[in-house]
Amino acid sequence: MGRMIASTFMSRFSAAQLGYAAGLKGYLDRPASLEFLKTMDIKHSVGHWSAGDFCDRFAPPGYHSDDPGFGTDFESQCRRTKAAGVDAIEIHQSVFEKTMNGDLDPAAIERAQRGVLAELGMVVTTCNINTWTNPKFRLGGPCNPDPALRKAALEEVLKGVEICKLMKIPVLSVWPGSDGADYHFQIDYKQSIEWFTEALVTVNKECLKHGIKLAIEPKPYEPRELYMIIPTAASAILVAQQVNKASGGNNCGLTIDYGHQKMEATTASTACDLAAFAGIQVHKFDINDARQGRNDQDLMFGTISIPESVEYLYTTFVRDYRGYYSQDQFTYREDPTRAIERSMINFANLALKAVRIYANQPALDKARQAGTGPDVLDVVSPVLVG
């Protein structure tokens, strides 16, 4: 078993990459961070919303609404992301709808592809689905008690498939943001999760036709206050298994959000390993930070718990994850460009620590066999706090 684990773990980086990382000294600034991520082939992206304005119930107009020069359109979000040093961005299907949950806007897609994306040399890595902003979905999207609205929500997800086809986006990610319950007895959970699974089976069959990966993103609660329909990584894995069983293949997988796992009072590292144990792929990781058991804070990455962040990245390397780590952060009062840049630099520096622990796997394996905290800390602490 030890030899099998070592073989798996050593597949993520080449000897040349590990040698390069071993030669790096001190703190990585912005140029060094960008070079490190490129050399190590660690992919980094940003959700378009993280480069926009931010609203909450305390500042409904938006924290940057007093700045007439602050654009909130997709082009402005792309330009801020690129200015932060990141050349990959995620979208929602609603970015390319004529109105919220209205008709697709192929002309807008073409303008973006030929215009700002081409100009900046940017790629779109994931299409997410919004079935919560429109008030018609206030009681749910794919799990709405009204069958007509369940159908409308399914159509929104299928629009995402169409956008992926048109823009050659490899991943479609579904976070059911309005589905769940606020009160006990409000829904029949088994019925609701069956509706959700049935919708995803339909979507996954379309994804399979076009080589698009389908991901489910779990979250314990918020905006639904009792629970979301997919509240845990384990529940997402169960649904993905059912979707794959009904569709054939293993195309349906997970999006794991770092902060959502903190809300769940587990870790993104254990969620990654649980998916690997179950044979379910992780198609995307959302990075941010949050305090354990609190709300979805979406802070800049690496600002709360460095050991936990490093273990998470280490685990993704051990499990040979090669997709994108995408910023999903709501830095309400900050300049989004500076916040994106700061997260990227933090991410690169913590990824370097994770690579160094990864490269010292035999020592970590030996310490784990001893089973004590000090033995393990003897291996990792020089990297974490040295």
Predicted regions and their residues:
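N-terminal pre-domain/capping segments
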Residues: G2-P170, G248-C252, M344-G386
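A short, acidic, amphipathic alpha-helical segment used as a generic capping/interface helix at domain edges
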Residues: L28-R30, T270, I304-V318
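Acidic/histidine-rich catalytic cores of soluble enzymes
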Residues: T39, V46, G52, F58, ...
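Active-site-proximal loop/turn and secondary-structure-junction residues that shape catalytic pockets
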Residues: S50-G52, Q93-V95, N128-T133, P176-G180, ...
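Flexible, acidic glycine-rich loops studded with aromatic residues
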Residues: F96, S309-L364
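Short, electropositive alpha-helical surface patch
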Residues: G102-L120, D146-R150, A181-E194, E225-Q241, ...
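Active-site groove signature of glycoside hydrolases
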Residues: C164-F185, K213-Y221
